[in-house]
Amino acid sequence: MARVTVQDAVEKIGNRFDLVLISSRRARQMQTGGKDALVPEENDKTTVIALREIEEGLITKELLDARERQEQQEQDAAELAAVSSITHNR
């Protein structure tokens, strides 16, 4: 198991507070959103995997925001299509 130091990840993000927010968002994505890890899992928990991804520069706040916006737009489009289908079939 590769050791992750918080300091390495803090240097990528800027401060510890943002690191907590970003790493928890990413860990939640992997746990509940079915998102795959971008680094080898090596039997690590999702929180450690998230920190490793941040440390390697694979995850940033901007990237998470963009992915979430895209997913929300796709979900909104699917819901709109479903509603449109229902109203046209009446």
Curated annotation (Swiss-Prot):
One of its GO terms (cellular component) is DNA-directed RNA polymerase complex. One of its GO terms (molecular function) is DNA binding. Gene3D superfamilies: 3.90.940.10. It is an enzyme of class 2 (transferase). Promotes RNA polymerase assembly. Latches the N- and C-terminal regions of the beta' subunit thereby facilitating its interaction with the beta and alpha subunits. HAMAP family: RNApol_bact_RpoZ. The RNAP catalytic core consists of 2 alpha, 1 beta, 1 beta' and 1 omega subunit. When a sigma factor is associated with the core the holoenzyme is formed, which can initiate transcription. This is DNA-directed RNA polymerase subunit omega. It comes from Aliivibrio fischeri (strain ATCC 700601 / ES114) (Vibrio fischeri).
